């Protein structure tokens, strides 16, 4: 039986499901909607979640949190698809793959519900006859598109209900020729509508037909000797041409297409959508995707396809996808056909120019994802450093933090490790290994004193940069000895703390009692990472040193080997590990090693095993 908290109650509920299409909602004990799904057959689909040893990792995790079930039956599978998208937007379930913050994606609105429509950016979609274009991936790109439109087309920019009871004074846009003055009643509604139709053509990507239309209108105006209107069309044509010259030609065939690229890493995904209109790359849209950790690529791309195209104002005749996900997108295509009256083609090119376009989109998705993860990491690390600064009352952010740890086996072969984190990340060039010189046996505080003394003295001698914080892996005794070393070196101003493993206690100089901070806070997570890295590095160095000394003693115990030939062996094989793996023939290649001695070496190595 799978790990479902309320298994019996859910089985009772399933009895009433039936075989109709619809949507199901898995809920937690607190009533949180965990996952929304659609099904052609609700009963069959929901029962699939009750299987033991489910092959899907994400479903196994979901099973452990399921407590309740809700469902909504629909008349058709298409209705279930539309309802699924609506429910995911409403509840934002954490087990669903979804567009990140998709409720906030901006659109460009053409307010056709007004006699003199405006063109503006909005996030609110109203069912009042206005036309919406989008969604765009961010406000910046949306405003850039809007600015281009407002430079090309002389539409009104001020938000007020027109026509006004009485004409107002013309604004600066009218004086500059960027508006035709509908607020003054200078342009009839019919003439203004012609300009709005041109804006819509532009937003729909039909720029070739728009240019052709404007050329005809300019010629007709010239023939009528309406030179003012002809000049206006000429200026619009010039601005459109300037805009088009900046666009990259990606297809000599022309045509309207969308090209989808995808990248993923950890629990984050990124989709890049290249909008090609009239053979030119018109827009690059970038969409972060959430909840991709254990999801298949087909599920992720299918979810994007659903969330984007069911809300898109325009769907091109052809869409190129980076994987064969026909099964996932066919229900969406069916709905789009009902909405638009045509069925877009979905293609998965395996070669040629279209495959090259897909690779461009995929490369852009990889770059966009890397940039986003880097920004997130930097933001998280900065938060961690700020918290550490507050925890330890530091004068400045701890840009450089060092941590020191002692490793030995019952006091033998003692070593120390020092690791350095810069801006919250490991800085491997700053890592240091130390063989303890002045202490034998178990004396961790004394060894810490030696290592800190050596480290600080080296910084002073080389005129280096002191760290902003030193963390000692240990308790109050080790920390006290480290502080003594700093005072002796004349570097007592460096902040130091001790981090004990037992309860993750923090010790401060001069304070007998430790402090305990929130284990899951960003600052403590970074400090534990630092301490664990110092421990790992120290254990690795200690193991290496112990193995070397063990090997040297083993070789020196070989009868008749002597110091000189031991040294030749180590030099020839460049290390002890290769001596362990050597054959008799390989040993004979070492100067001074004959058959008799080679056999003695092999026997000695066998004793070790």
Curated annotation (Swiss-Prot):
Pfam hit, one: HHH_5
Metal-binding among keywords: no
SUPFAM superfamilies linked: C-terminal UvrC-binding domain of UvrB, GIY-YIG endonuclease, RuvA domain 2-like
Cellular component terms (Gene Ontology): cytoplasm; excinuclease repair complex
Subcellular location, record wording: Cytoplasm
CDD domains for this protein: GIY-YIG_UvrC_Cho
Source organism superkingdom: Bacteria
Location of the UVR domain: 208-243
The keyword DNA repair is assigned to this record: yes
Residue ranges of every copy of the GIY-YIG domain listed in the record: 19-97
Primary subcellular site in the record, as a coarse category: cytoplasm
Keywords: Cytoplasm, DNA damage, DNA excision, DNA repair, Excision nuclease, SOS response
GO biological process, one term: SOS response
A single GO molecular function term of this UniProt record: excinuclease ABC activity
Assembly and binders: Interacts with UvrB in an incision complex.
UniProt family annotation: Belongs to the UvrC family.
Alphabetical list of NCBIfam families matching this protein: PRK00558.1-5, uvrC
Function: The UvrABC repair system catalyzes the recognition and processing of DNA lesions. UvrC both incises the 5' and 3' sides of the lesion. The N-terminal half is responsible for the 3' incision and the C-terminal half is responsible for the 5' incision.
Entry protein name: UvrABC system protein C
Gene: uvrC
């Amino acid at each position: 039986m799978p790990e479902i908290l309320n298994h019996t109650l859910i089985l009772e509920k399933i009895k009433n499901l039936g075989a109709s299409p619809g949507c199901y909602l898995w809920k937690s004990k607190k009533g949180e909607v965990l996952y929304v799904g659609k099904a052609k057959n609700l009963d069959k689909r929901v029962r699939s979640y009750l299987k033991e040893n489910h092959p899907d990792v994400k479903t196994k995790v979901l099973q452990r949190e399921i407590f309740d079930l809700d469902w909504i039956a629909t008349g058709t599978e298409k209705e279930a698809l539309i309802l699924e998208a609506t429910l995911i937007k409403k509840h934002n379930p954490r087990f669903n793959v979804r567009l990140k913050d998709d409720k906030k994606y901006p659109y460009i609105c053409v307010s056709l519900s007004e006699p003199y429509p405006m063109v503006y950016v909005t996030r609110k979609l109203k069912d009042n006859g206005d036309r919406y274009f989008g969604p765009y991936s961010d406000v910046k790109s949306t405003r850039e598109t809007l600015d281009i439109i407002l430079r090309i087309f002389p539409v009104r920019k001020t938000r007020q209900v027109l026509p006004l009871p009485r004409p107002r004074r013309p604004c600066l846009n009218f004086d500059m020729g960027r508006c035709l003055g509908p607020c003054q009643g200078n342009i009839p509604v019919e003439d203004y509508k012609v300009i709005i139709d041109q804006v819509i053509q532009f937003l729909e990507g039909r720029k070739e037909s728009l240019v052709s239309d404007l050329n005809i209108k300019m010629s007709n105006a010239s023939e009528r000797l309406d030179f003012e209107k002809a000049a206006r069309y000429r200026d619009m044509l010039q601005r459109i041409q300037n805009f088009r010259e900046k666009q990259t030609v990606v297809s000599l065939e022309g045509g309207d297409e969308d090209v989808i690229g995808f990248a993923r890493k950890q629990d984050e995904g990124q989709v890049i959508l290249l909008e090609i209109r009239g053979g030119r790359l018109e827009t690059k849209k970038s969409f972060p995707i959430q909840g991709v950790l254990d999801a298949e690529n087909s599920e992720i791309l299918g979810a994007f396809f659903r969330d984007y195209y069911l809300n898109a104002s325009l769907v091109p005749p052809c869409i190129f996808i980076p994987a064969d996900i026909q099964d996932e997108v066919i229900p969406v295509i069916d709905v789009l056909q009902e909405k638009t009256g045509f069925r877009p083609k979905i293609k998965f090119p395996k070669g040629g120019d279209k495959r090259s376009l897909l690779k461009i989109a995929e490369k852009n998705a990889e770059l966009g994802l890397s940039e986003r993860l880097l920004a997130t990491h930097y933001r998280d690390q900065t938060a961690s450093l700020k918290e550490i600064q507050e925890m330890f009352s530091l004068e400045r952010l701890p840009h450089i933090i060092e941590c020191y740890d002692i490793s030995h086996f019952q006091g033998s072969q003692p070593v120390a490790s020092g690791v350095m984190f810069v801006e919250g990340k490991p800085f491997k060039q700053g890592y240091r290994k130390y063989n303890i010189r002045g202490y034998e046996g178990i004396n961790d505080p004394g060894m810490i004193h030696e290592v800190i003394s050596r480290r600080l003295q080296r910084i002073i001698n080389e005129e280096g940069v002191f760290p902003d914080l030193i963390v000692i892996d240990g308790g109050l005794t080790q920390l006290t000895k480290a502080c003594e070393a700093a005072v002796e070196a004349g570097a007592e101003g460096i902040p130091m703390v001790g981090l004990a493993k037992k309860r993750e206690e923090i010790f401060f100089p001069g304070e007998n009692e430790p402090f305990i901070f929130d284990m899951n806070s960003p600052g403590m997570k970074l400090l534990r990472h630092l301490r664990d890295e110092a421990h790992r590095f120290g254990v690795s160095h200690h193991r290496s040193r112990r193995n070397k000394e063990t090997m040297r003693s083993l070789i020196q115990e070989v009868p008749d080997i002597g110091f000189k030939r031991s040294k030749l062996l180590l030099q020839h094989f460049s290390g002890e590990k290769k001596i362990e793996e050597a054959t008799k023939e390989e040993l004979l290649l070492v100067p001074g090693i004959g058959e008799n001695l080679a056999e003695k070496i092999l026997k000695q190595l066998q004793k070790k095993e």
